[in-house]
From Swiss-Prot:
Protein name: Gag-Pol polyprotein
Listed Pfam families: Gag_p17, Gag_p24_C, IN_DBD_C, Integrase_Zn, RNase_H, rve, RVP, RVT_1
Active site as annotated: D509
Annotated segments matching region Interaction with Gp41: 7-31
Lipidation (N-myristoyl glycine): G2
Reverse transcriptase domain sequence ranges: 627-817
Interaction with host CALM1 as annotated region, ranges: 8-43
Motif (Tryptophan repeat motif): 981-997
Name of the encoding gene: gag-pol
Cofactor binding note from Swiss-Prot or TrEMBL: Binds 2 magnesium ions for reverse transcriptase polymerase activity.
Region (Interaction with membrane phosphatidylinositol 4,5-bisphosphate and RNA): 14-33
Length: 1431
């Protein structure tokens, strides 16, 4: 204790002992806490001397802080003690531990802010905003986004389909990008238009919000000063690239790129939530799920979380363990908080589920009954063996039970002076009998240090160097290797050896440590030795430095001579010879495969097969079994998949097929390694070319051993003569969904080293087809091809000579390749009198294939023939248009057309032509009349479109195709005037992409047939249109009202809401002049017409298009649905004049009947009968009884839920006692016979029996101050308060309600004979038929809500300590970064209240993640306090 007493002295020690352990506590810090802290520091391998200075304390806290979240109570207590000691050293005045922690946190925040400001100042000095870079002249220059980046982005979207990984990938790829670059990235996404529309909406919202928060300054911009960017400037629509660069590099800068990027990320977050709504909190390990798979899913989702790195680290430390299954969680917690991910995965390997429990049980059993002894003799068929005595050599008993005299010396080594239990020598164990070492340890020989790392092969192969270099053979084998005999293991590897000049036959045994020979005379001295052998121990003579010659190779080492049943060459000699075990069938690593979670393998019965098919399948399977591709299995495998056979095309041979459809449904999904096939137009011209084919491709790759059982199939016997023969696959089966992906992945890994060693060789790989090109001379090229074939053969992949193409033309992937040109393989279109659906499908497929090099191919009319549900064998008559189209295609295909190869030094040019009937054709070339490839486009992505939109879609398709094939986009030549294009594109900048392009005058030119105005047309008539339909009876109405008093309503049958909205617009266009303004509330109709279609699949939309073309000018606008929102009086008139009013007629009658009975206010009727507010107010206004003094206004008084005000009022000479619940305005009232204390007390007790009454507030009337009332209040536990005499405001609520009650009584008095009846009717109307005030509730609904809320509040307050155990991570405002952890103060249905540092915030529930903090049960200094309480 004295050793650390010098940490504090004098005044500092006094200050230390004045500080309390926790706020409001009695205990103070003492000297013993310093001693405890110094000892704890030694436990954590920290120098206790650091406690003597404030700098040392700061270093300790820096070390401890990362572990606080998951640390023990002792660790947190140590941190709190050091923090308090730091404040004492720094002379910071604190009263307790919590205050010390707050002071340190405040100091750290200030330090962090200074660091960030310094970094920001450094960044401001130079432009960090790549791709904006500074050139030699000091100017800021923009480098356009590269084709490689665009290609990577397109692949990400296509492969991931807006899964969470898309956001970090976008963030990484768009680092420092300008808005123009970001738009280029977005617009390369050709598909996913729904997602792009969502993104566009988000950007528009953010741009509008920017404009609202950054209003334009009045007056002109000063000379030399940049204008401030608007929302559309940031989005890149109304700003130039130079303006964007200037804003980004100005002083001070406006980072328009980063702002726009933030908007896009907000939109991408919405899209990701829609496409894959997975939170990190939802990632939990299944009971049988391997820990590795769980970790993969966890980190995949964690990468997509928008949170700081500190938060992600916390999630990894806490959630990864917290959400593991119980088996893994037990192991992980035992590892402790500092375990690395590698340690976790190693510890949890193979853990989980029944299999794990079975292994644990088996392990326990094996320790009890160790039967892991392998016998060498071939007649031993199991672990059972005959026991033999080591003492006398007889069988049937053990040495410890032997009655014979005990042999002298040790039974293990034969030496005297010790027993076997004390023997230190290790046995030879060359027969792998685990007599001395139950765990199976093998003896290490002296030559074991020279052992080579053997590659895994399935045959014994001897490698070596020079025959004469004996020492090098044993010590240094790094030289060039020579091939020696390969010995298969189908039989025992016996070889002839020469030892001591004598020839012997010996067994090469890689499991034996030593070389043991039968009785043979050897030169030199020997020493006795005892080794473990068959049937016990045998005595041998040990000769050192003996020369042995095996297969022409020589080795020197130790040889044991004794009564061995077979000569053994052990590893001490084999390693010197360089002998290795090799596996030529399949050295490829297997890819682990599993079934989908919760699914079992297929159990489909075998179909009936004919005799010839059974014989054919039997022969095929026998051959496959001999080759090791399949293995026979027994009845223990419960799975089955049907198998059948078909004859090969143009052959008498049979082909085996397995119907893996059921297994494919149950197998987990694979990512396709390649998105499509390589295209010859992307090939660079090469001097020498070869095309290879991998033989039996799938059968060269092994299948995961654990998955093989699911591929089981059965070959039945004829007439069920015998049980069916059962097999399972050892290799990738044909027809299984995983085979293509695993094969492609395996082939890529195999080719990787060859590609790295031969960068001058280009290899295009698709499935089993290989294109190999180089600029080498033909001789050198063919030598490299042989190297490649040998490389593939080493891995078990053969390349048959019959498919080895050495001379052009090369047939590859359906193409025909020549040295300087390419084409598709010859296409013959069939001549038929009648065409089936299947024939036309094949015909369209051939024409589509030909269209990539033959320009002008069309298939639209042929495809129309296939519309509708038709059987494949149905006869389809060709229409006149289809026959014409087919004849044109035949003409095109008559002349062979060739494409050229790609030259990287030249630009790509794409030219598009319109063919009519929504069909387009295009050519991509680098030199005129030398096409790289051609194609067509004929899709209608929407039901309503126009030529400009179709042209932009074709441009997108070509650009995407170009990025995939060449990695860059071409320059476009388009048949459209620049003015026409820009007029349409202005409103669709986000949906389409504008590449570099130029006008080409190739008729027919594309044009817009009409254009909508941007602003209302002055002087033109305005039509307010609307439509509505009943879904059940399909009846509807459409109509309009104009600002000039005209109106029209038509009834429509068999219609929908959307059709009536369009019908209303059609009526307005039909009845209007050449110029018209139209206002609609339908986003559907607005979206169709604003896209300016000139053709549609809808007849009604075509009629609207015809009307629009006839008009000179049209303005179309949208307002929210016709409910008076935004003060649109004209739309309200439309509602009340016909269209909407028709829909409310039934409700109006019911509301009027209700009002005549109860005189409900307008809010109650609007809510109950779904009336527009204007209609409900009109009903109240037309009631003479409700217009005496206008409608009473109600307010909310901020009072406790248990407070009531009581008062007596008089009407018709009678006394009415009224009680009002202050918080809700709810009334209880009764006519009482007399204003006495007895009657009042009785009323109070009835009130207390119905509602929770805590306080009653009355005036000083004689009945209220009577002893009877006081006694009733005392008994019921009610506190009574009195108002101020002669001041009616102190009873304001009940006084107001008295007037309201009398007014309602006046409205219903004629409906009741007695006053007491009218009073109860008025109470009912007030409590349940009048809505208003906070929440728009009635008083009855409000009091129930307030009481229920009060109960919930009290229950939640009881759990406040539990709530404080939770931590909250939240997003603030529009910032996508997660903040936290913060302290949870309150959790409601819609929002939570949290405390972050000293700030208390209310955050919507959808923007928070609430997580239990398992690391510490008590916060702050409590841990320290509890620790000290134990002392």
């Amino acid at each position: 204790m004295g050793a650390r007493a010098s940490i504090l002295r004098g005044g500092k020690l006094d200050a230390w002992e004045r500080i309390k352990l926790k706020p409001g506590g009695k205990k103070h810090y003492m000297m013993k806490h310093l001693v405890w802290a110094s000892r704890e520091l030694e436990r954590f391998a920290l120098d206790p001397g650091l406690l003597e200075t404030s700098e040392g304390c700061k270093q300790i806290m820096k070390q401890l802080q990362p572990a606080l979240q998951t640390g023990t109570k002792e660790l947190i207590s140590l941190h709190n003690t050091v923090a308090t000691l730091y404040c004492v050293h720094e002379k910071i005045d604190v009263r307790d531990t919590k205050e010390a922690l707050d002071k340190i946190k405040e100091e750290q925040n200030k330090s962090q802010q200074k660091t960030q400001q310094a970094e920001a100042a450094d960044k401001g000095k130079v432009s960090q905003n790549y791709p904006i870079v500074q050139n030699l002249q000091g100017q800021m220059v923009h480098q356009p986004i590269s084709a490689r980046t665009l290609n990577a982005w397109v692949k990400v979207v296509e492969e991931k389909a807006f899964s969470p990984e898309v956001i970090p990938m976008f963030t990484a790829l768009s680092e420092g990008a300008t808005p123009q670059d970001l738009n280029t990235m977005l617009n390369t996404v050709g598909g996913h238009q729904a997602a792009m529309q969502m993104l566009k909406d988000t950007i528009n919202e953010e741009a509008a919000e920017w404009d609202r928060l950054h209003p334009v300054h009045a007056g002109p911009v000063a000379p030399g000063q940049m204008r401030e960017p608007r929302g559309s400037d940031i989005a890149g629509t109304t700003s130039t690239l130079q303006e964007q660069i200037t804003w980004m590099t100005n002083n001070p800068p406006v980072p328009v790129g980063d702002i726009y990027k933030r908007w896009i990320i907000l939109g991408l977050n919405k899209i990701v939530r829609m496409y894959s709504p997975v939170s990190i909190l939802d990632i939990k390990q299944g009971p049988k799920e391997p820990f590795r798979d769980y970790v993969d899913r966890f980190f995949k989702t964690l990468r997509a979380e928008q949170a700081t790195q500190d938060v992600k680290n916390w999630m990894t430390d806490t959630l990864l363990v917290q959400n593991a299954n119980p088996d893994c969680k037990t192991i992980l917690r035992a590892l402790g908080p500092g375990a690395s991910l590698e340690e976790m995965m190693t510890a949890c390997q193979g853990v989980g589920g029944p299999g794990h429990k079975a292994r644990v049980l088996a392990e326990a059993m094996s320790k009890v009954n160790n039967t892991n002894i392998m016998m060498q003799r071939s007649n031993c068929k199991g672990p059972k063996r005959t026991i033999k005595c080591f003492n006398c050599g007889k069988e049937g008993h053990l040495a410890r039970n032997c009655r014979a005299p005990r042999k002298k010396g040790c039974w293990k080594c034969g030496k005297e002076g010790h027993q076997v239990k004390d023997c230190t020598e290790r046995q030879a164990n060359f027969f792998r009998e685990n007599l001395a070492f139950p765990q199976g340890e093998a003896r290490k020989s002296s030559s074991e240090q020279n052992r080579a790392n053997s590659p895994t092969r399935r045959e014994l192969q001897v490698w070596g160097r020079d025959n004469n270099s004996l020492s090098e053979a044993g010590d240094d084998r790094q030289g060039t290797a020579l091939n020696f005999p390969q010995i298969t293991l189908w039989q025992r590897p016996l070889v002839n050896i020469k030892v001591g000049g004598q020839l012997k036959e010996a067994l090469l045994d890689t499991g034996a440590d030593d070389t043991v020979l039968e009785e043979i005379k050897l030169p030199g001295n020997w020493k006795p030795k005892m080794i473990g052998g068959i049937g016990g121990f045998i005595k041998v003579r040990q000769y050192d430095q003996i020369l042995i010659e095996i297969c022409g190779k020589k080795a020197i080492g130790t040889v044991l001579v004794g009564p061995t049943p077979v000569n053994i060459i052990g590893r001490n000699m084999l390693t010197q010879l360089g002998c290795t075990l090799n596996f030529p069938i399949s050295p490829i690593e297997t890819v682990p495969v599993k079934l989908k979670p919760g699914m079992d393998g297929p159990k489909v019965k075998q179909w009936l097969l004919t005799e010839e098919k059974i014989k054919a399948l039997t022969a095929i399977c026998d051959e496959m079994e001999r080759e090791g591709k399949i293995t026979k299995i027994g009845p223990e495998n419960p799975y089955n998949t049907p198998v059948f056979a078909i004859k090969k095309k143009d052959s008498t041979k049979w082909r085996k097929l397995v119907d893996f459809r059921e297994l494919n449904k149950r197998t987990w999904d694979f990512w396709e390694v390649q998105l499509g096939i390589p295209h010859p137009a992307g090939l660079k011209k090469k001097k020498s070319v070869t095309v290879l084919d991998v033989g039996d491709a799938y059968f060269s790759v092994p299948l995961d051993e654990g998955f093989r059982k699911y591929t089981a199939f059965t070959i039945p016997s004829i007439n069920n003569e015998t049980p069916g023969i059962r097999y399972q696959y050892n290799v990738l089966p044909q027809g299984w969904k995983g085979s293509p992906s695993i094969f492609q992945s395996s082939t890529t890994k195999i080719l990787e080293p060859f590609r790295a060693q031969n960068p001058e060789i280009i290899i295009y790989q698709y499935m089993d087809d290989l294109y190999v090109g180089s600029d080498l001379e033909i001789g050198q090229h063919r030598a490299k091809i042989e190297e490649l074939r040998e490389h593939l053969l080493k891995w078990g992949f053969t390349t048959p000579d019959k498919k080895h193409q050495k001379e052009p033309p090369f047939l590859w992937m359906g193409y025909e390749l020549h040295p300087d040109k390419w084409t598709v393989q010859p296409i013959q279109l069939p001549e038929k009198d009648s065409w089936t659906v299947n024939d036309i499908q094949k015909l369209v497929g051939k024409l589509n294939w030909a269209s990539q090099i033959y320009p002008g191919i069309k298939v639209r009319q042929l495809c129309k023939l296939l519309r509708g549900a038709k059987a494949l064998t149905d006869i389809v008559p060709l229409t006149e248009e289809a026959e014409l189209e087919l004849a044109e295609n035949r003409e095109i295909l008559k002349e062979p057309v060739h494409g050229v190869y790609y030259d990287p030094s030249k630009d790509l040019i794409a030219e598009i032509q319109k063919q009519g009937q929504n069909q387009w054709t295009y050519q991509i070339y680098q030199e005129p009349f030398k096409n790289l490839k051609t194609g067509k486009y004929a899709k209608m992505r929407t039901a309503h479109t126009n030529d400009v939109r179709q042209l932009t879609e074709a441009v997108q398709k070509i650009a995407l195709e170009s990025i995939i094939i060449w990695g860059k986009t071409p320059k476009f030549r388009l048949p459209i005037q620049k003015e026409t294009w820009e007029a349409w594109w202005t409103d669709y900048w986000q949906a389409t992409w504008i590449p570099e392009w130029e006008f080409v005058n190739t008729p027919p030119l594309v044009k817009l047939w009409y254009q909508l105005e941007k602003e209302p047309i002055a002087g033109a008539e305005t039509f307010y249109v609307d439509g509505a339909a009943n879904r059940e009876i399909k009846m509807g109405k459409a109509g309009y009202v104009t600002d000039r008093g005209r109106q029209k309503i038509v009834s429509i049958t068999e219609t929908t809401n959307q059709k009536t909205e369009l019908q209303a617009i059609q009526l307005a266009l039909q009845d209007s002049g050449s110029e018209v303004n139209i206002v609609t509330d339908s986003q559907y109709a607005l979206g169709i017409i604003q896209a300016q279609p000139d053709k549609s699949e809808s007849e009604l939309v075509n009629q609207i298009i015809e009307q629009l073309i006839k008009k000179e000018r049209v303005y179309l606008s949208w307002v929210p649905a016709h409910k008076g929102i935004g003060g649109n009086e004209q739309v309200d008139k439309l509602v009340s004049s016909g269209i909407r009013k028709v829909l409310f007629l039934d409700g109006i009658n019911k509301a009027q009947e209700e009002h005549e009975k109860y005189h409900s206010n307008w809010r109650a009727m609007a809510s109950e009968f779904n009336l527009p507010p204007i209609v409900a107010k009109e009903i109240v206004a037309s009631c003479d009884k409700c217009q005496l003094k206008g409608e009473a206004t109600h307010g909310q008084v901020d009072c406790s839920p248990g407070i009531w005000q009581l008062d007596c009022t008089h009407l018709e000479g009678k006394i009415i006692l009224v009680a009002v619940h202050v918080a809700s305005g709810y009334i209880e009232a009764e006519v009482i016979p007399a204003e006495t204390g007895q009657e009042t007390a009785y009323f109070i007790l009835k009130l207390a029996g119905r509602w929770p009454v805590k306080v009653i507030h009355t005036d000083n009337g004689s009945n209220f101050i009577s002893n009877t009332v006081k006694a009733a209040c005392w008994w019921a536990g009610i506190q009574q308060e009195f108002g101020i005499p002669y001041n009616p405001q102190s009873q304001g609520v009940v006084e107001s309600m008295n007037k309201e009650l009398k007014k309602i009584i006046g409205q219903v008095r004629d409906q009741a004979e007695h006053l007491k009846t009218a009073v109860q009717m008025a109470v009912f109307i007030h409590n349940f038929k009048r809505k208003g005030g906070i929440g728009g509730y009635s008083a009855g609904e409000r009091i129930i809500d307030i009481i229920a809320t009060d109960i919930q509040t009290k229950e939640l307050q009881k759990q406040i300590m539990k709530i404080q155990n939770f931590r909250v991570y939240y997003r603030d405002s529009r910032d996508p970064i997660w903040k936290g952890p913060a302290k949870l103060l309150w959790k409601g249905e819609g929002a939570v209240v949290l405390q972050d540092n000293s700030d208390i915030k209310v955050v919507p529930r959808r923007k928070v993640k609430i997580i239990k903090d398992y690391g510490k049960q008590m916060a702050g200094a409590d841990c320290m306090a509890s620790r000290q309480d134990e002392d």
